[in-house]
A protein has these predicted regions:
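Alpha-helical transmembrane segments of integral membrane proteins, especially early/N-terminal helices
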Residues: 1-13, 35-41
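Alpha-helical transmembrane segments
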Residues: 7-19, 80, 113
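Alpha-helical membrane-associated segments of multi-pass integral membrane proteins
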Residues: 14, 93-137
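Juxtamembrane "helix-exit" motif on the non-cytosolic side of transmembrane helices
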Residues: 20-32, 58, 85-96
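Non-cytosolic membrane-interface motifs at loop->transmembrane helix junctions
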Residues: 32-40, 66, 96-107
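Generic alpha-helical transmembrane segments
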Residues: 35-56, 109-113
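Loop-to-transmembrane helix junctions at the membrane interface
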Residues: 52-79
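C-terminal halves and exits of single transmembrane alpha-helices
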Residues: 72-101
């Protein structure tokens, strides 16, 4: 049972690539004022992250018997996206239509939901023995 598994690292690496590509595309489309395409790539970006998390998370669930209700994936996404977005602004790669404040507000709200997810994780963890659900052990 590994907290930082190969599947989680694969997800983090793919997420970083997706985020950088998304940021490049977002900046270019915002600069060109192509609002429709901004929405399209945003939805595609979110969908791609969801599918990647679903696939790597399911595979991890089969290989690594840890019951965390997806918290590790949520936390990894929060950290990778936050660092990539902050770095994007610190390096001056953002569009004039992008604001660091939007990143900070997103991280603040997301952090609140992440905290709630952590509480859920702790509650579910009480129902497990060393990360394995009790019903999986005693059936």
């Amino acid at each position: 049972m590994k907290i930082i598994s190969r599947n989680l690292l694969l997800f983090a690496a793919l997420l970083l690539i997706y985020t950088l590509l998304f940021r490049f595309g977002l900046g270019a489309l915002l600069t060109q004022k192509k609002w429709f395409w901004v929405v399209i790539i945003s939805v595609l970006y979110g969908g791609l992250i969801f599918v990647t998390a679903l696939m790597t998370g399911r595979r991890d669930g089969k290989e690594n018997f840890i019951f965390d209700a997806g918290f590790r994936w949520n936390f990894t996404t929060f950290v990778v996206w936050g660092i990539a977005s902050e770095a994007w602004f610190l390096l001056g790669l953002h569009s004039t239509y992008e604001s660091i404040r939007a990143v900070h507000i997103t991280l603040f709200i997301w952090g609140g939901f992440l905290f709630l997810h952590f509480i859920l994780f702790l509650i579910l963890r009480r129902r497990t023995i060393k990360g394995v659900h009790k019903t999986d052990i005693f059936e």
